[in-house]
Amino acid sequence: MRTKLTTHFLLLFLLVSSISFANLKITNDQDPEKDKVLISVLNYMLTKGHYNQKELNDDFSEMVFNNFIADLDPSKRYFTKIDIKEFSKYKYQIDNQLKESDIAFYSLVYGRFLEKIKNAKNYYNAILKKPFNYKKDEVIDLDFKAIDYAKTEKELLNFWRKQLKLQTIDKIRDQENLDEEEFKKDQSFKKRSFSTLEKKARADVMESMENLYIRIDELEHRDWFSTF
């Protein structure tokens, strides 16, 4: 029953997420008609989705709380501990909110997520404008399930910097390997300088980030109601 319940709920949230993307991005004003659609979907799933009311409890709330936040930010590069603390006031209230067609938790978390997306664009644009300090040895833990959320926005920005530095280093190595292969084929081939490789690597990382957030923006602006 728990698996079935979880599946139903995830499907519900995917549908509601689709609708809410349009609601949150098209206008900052509350739209009563769109709110009615959200509430109708929630009510339908609760009344027609064969939920076991006994399982709509604090355990269920905690599961939804953890899974929803983890799905939005699996690499912990958007939310901080401050955000999670604010979200936590709803940790054991989601079951009651669903029964009452209340989307306060969803609106808070998803609205904050959209704000963080905007911040992320500023982060990578600023970080990738100039070369990294490659003489400085740094450590980054990419076990996202094990690491904790950043304590502050400053700490989060540093986490972004380390990730982008690592991506840039990987691309530099790829380009160095390509040059080495060309040199083996033709020893008259002139290998590119480190500064040239570094500049191209940062540009490639920037392009990857731009493409990623273009796709995210398209999702945010898509007219979900036309497919509802």
Model-flagged regions — what are they?
Residues R2, S20-T227:
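Flexible, low-complexity junctional segments that flank or bridge functional domains
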Residues F9-S18:
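Bacterial N-terminal signal peptides
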Residues M1-F9:
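Bacterial N-terminal signal peptides that target proteins for export
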